[in-house]
Amino acid sequence: MYKKQVKLQRILCLALLIVSALIFLYSLGIMTDLYDALYNTIRNPNKLDKTTVTGSRVYYDMQDFNKNFLKASIVMILLCVSLFITQTQSRRKYYIGNYIDTALVAAGGIAFSVWAHGEIEAFKAQFLAINFEELAEHAAKKKSLYTESTFWFDIHYVLFGLLVIGVILLIANAVWKRKLMKEEQALIAQGEEAAA
């Protein structure tokens, strides 16, 4: 039973690190199509409403979010790395530090997911308000990218869904670990009583 449990926690810790790295890559790519399609629609960044495409200011509006999103994804990677530093992925018996680390990763993952989901959905709505007829005309004139795709907005459902599932399983694993340790201590106590 312990081997299965330890194997599961190794897989969970590694999976959380991989998902966090994918979210980091996502934070680097989320603005790519917006840049290619919308950057040159605004002639003067100091006057965002003077544009050849109505609504194209979403690219500029997302800049601060994207900076914070990148920083938050790095923090999430560091939190997941801390699982390996505290050896949470391989300990048969958890110490208080392992439980604290597990709680930090879980809280960070849930908070990050809720915050990012709200922001990305708001910017997706702003993107969908763009006048796509004007964008098509602009793209034809300037030979720039034309897209109505919301792929970069929608993929967050998969990534943050995996993160939330991962942290829920990490918490479940810690509870399971605690239960196994209590059962082991009860067996040891019974053995000591029988020997006495």
Task: State each model region's role.
Residues M1-Q5, G55-K93:
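Alpha-helical transmembrane segments and their immediate interhelical/interface regions
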Residues Y2-L8, I85-G97, I120-L128, L162-A195:
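Cytosolic juxtamembrane helix at the C-terminal end of the final transmembrane segment
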Residues Q5-A15, T147-Y157:
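Loop-to-transmembrane boundary segments
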Residues A15-T32, I100-A122:
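Hydrophobic alpha-helical membrane-insertion segments
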Residues L34-N66, W115-D154:
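Interfacial non-cytosolic loop connecting adjacent transmembrane helices
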Residues V75-C80, Y157-I171:
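Hydrophobic cores of alpha-helical transmembrane segments in multi-pass inner/ER membrane proteins
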Residues I96-I100, I155-V158:
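Hydrophobic alpha-helical transmembrane segments
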